């Protein structure tokens, strides 16, 4: 009898331990930028020497052309200017009324207590619904980040991605960016606005005591996972 009771106690403790471990687990956060954040340019093969002064092999940008990114490994400055405002309002107003009346020539004895001395009955009903809701959001992100060309598409567009890390005291901040850039939108100072980048993904995260202070404690996560409400 005691052995069975001890086994049940062990099973209960094991179940509580599993629940506690599930409650303590952190929710995995998938990074928004999935592409590699850097790329190295492949070395070019040395062409045959055709002269003592001028070599006709391609060695970079032409002499009378701007130095703009066009190959894998080239760098580009992204000027982040994101201002997003969204507002949503909704409302519902509905009402319904109904009535029914009945008249009896004679009332059965079994129902005499319900109708007392009257042989008429009426039913009235009404319901109403009124609801409203609203939501608003405003996000502003300004800054610069230098990215690397990862791939040159068939139409000439550039797939870029990059990361910037900044450590301050016990905290670290990460800015990641990826997207597709049209070379025609690149300015003379080798920059492009983030609003002109297709499929742009901008991520700003941090690690440190400030980020930890914004996370829920392990006991709160435990009760949040086991609570049925």
Curated annotation (Swiss-Prot):
This protein's UniProt keywords: Bacterial flagellum, Cell outer membrane, Lipoprotein, Membrane, Palmitate, Signal
> Subunit structure, briefly?
The basal body constitutes a major portion of the flagellar organelle and consists of four rings (L,P,S, and M) mounted on a central rod.
Work out whether the entry's keyword set contains Repressor.
Answer: no
Among InterPro entries, the record links this protein to: Flag_Lring
Q: How does it sit in the membrane?
A: Lipid-anchor
Q: Where is the signal peptide?
A: 1-23
A biological process from GO: bacterial-type flagellum-dependent cell motility
Q: Lipid anchor (N-palmitoyl cysteine) at which residues?
A: 24
The family database entries (HAMAP family) matched by this protein are listed as: FlgH
Tell me yes or no: is Signal among this UniProt entry's keywords: yes
Tell me the function of this protein.
Answer: Assembles around the rod to form the L-ring and probably protects the motor/basal body from shearing forces during rotation.
- Where is this protein localized, as stated in its record? Cell outer membrane; Bacterial flagellum basal body
**The organism of origin for this protein:** Cupriavidus pinatubonensis (strain JMP 134 / LMG 1197)
Q: Which residue numbers carry lipidation of type S-diacylglycerol cysteine? A: 24
GO molecular function (one):
cytoskeletal motor activity
Q: What is this protein called?
A: Flagellar L-ring protein
Q: Which gene encodes it?
A: flgH
- One Pfam family from the record: FlgH
Recorded GO CC terms: bacterial-type flagellum basal body, distal rod, L ring; cell outer membrane
Indicate the family of this protein.
Belongs to the FlgH family.
